[in-house]
A protein has these predicted regions:
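Bacterial N-terminal signal peptides
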Residues: 7-17
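Exported/periplasmic ABC-transporter solute-binding proteins
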Residues: 23-49, 55-57, 62-243
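Positively charged n-region of N-terminal signal peptides that target proteins for export
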Residues: 1-6
Length: 243
């Protein structure tokens, strides 16, 4: 009986250690604010599948990368590959998530019907994310310049910090139109008057990737997240979020 009791205790202790290890597993993912809903849904599904807790950080890409440089706690950054490749951050792994698309979200009640209407006097305020810090701010200014509209409307452009801030201005009607990404646009389709896709040939393609920082511990949780992104469940989420 003594041997059996000892073996039973060893099994209990072993299971306890495994449970403690699993509970301690955590990932920290930082992402562009325009992909909050995508990251939230992916994180929820990943946690349900693995039991691993996911902490999420959002901001424009300049904010996100600056925080990653200052902190060793961030495991992944999800955002524009071109922007991330120009930073001093060192990455160990990369997984393509999808292609980001620029959308003009028109406020309810605005007279704007097409992007050619941007030059009309009835369009008084146009919001874009900061082009120096946010991917879709850069994409918006590229489009407006390549379309030959920038010089005519720049005095009516309101530059804000992030995509969600642009969204807030559109929903409140404080601007006539705002430039955001498709993922964000899908979330507000019932709160905007009109969503106009922007010609993808008039701005640099936006490839959204998940990059694992080299500073991230080589944990089972991190490896499992890369694998998870390639599953059918994750791909369905990504597709529904406009990527």
């Amino acid at each position: 009986m003594g041997v059996i009791r000892i073996l039973s205790l060893l099994v209990i202790l072993s299971c306890s250690c495994i449970s403690t290890l699993q509970a301690a597993e955590k990932l920290t993912i930082a992402a562009g604010a325009g992909y909050r809903r995508l990251v939230e849904q992916l994180s929820t599904a990943y946690t349900a599948s693995t039991g691993v807790t996911v902490e999420q950080i959002f901001g424009n890409m300049a904010q996100v990368t600056a925080q990653a440089q200052e902190s060793s706690a961030i495991d992944f950054i999800i955002g524009d590959k071109e922007y991330l490749d120009t930073t001093p951050l060192s990455f160990a792994q990369e997984c393509v998530v999808g292609s980001g698309k620029l959308i003009a979200a028109v406020a309810k009640g605005s007279a704007l019907k097409t992007l050619n209407d941007l030059t009309e006097k009835t369009v008084t305020r146009i919001a874009i994310p900061d082009p120096k810090k946010a991917t879709f701010g850069r994409a918006a200014t590229e489009f407006l310049s390549n379309k030959g509209l920038w010089q005519q409307i720049q005095d009516r452009v309101l530059i804000v910090g992030t995509v969600p801030q642009v969204t807030a201005y559109v929903i409140s009607g404080e601007v006539d139109v705002g430039f955001i990404n498709l993922t964000e646009a899908l979330a507000i389709k019932d709160k905007a008057g009109l969503l106009i896709p922007v010609d993808e040939h008039l701005y640099t393609p936006v490839l959204i990737v998940a990059k694992r920082l080299r500073q991230s511990p080589d944990s089972q949780a991190a490896n499992a997240f890369i694998t998870f992104l390639q599953t059918g469940e994750a791909q369905d989420i990504i597709k529904k979020q406009g990527l």
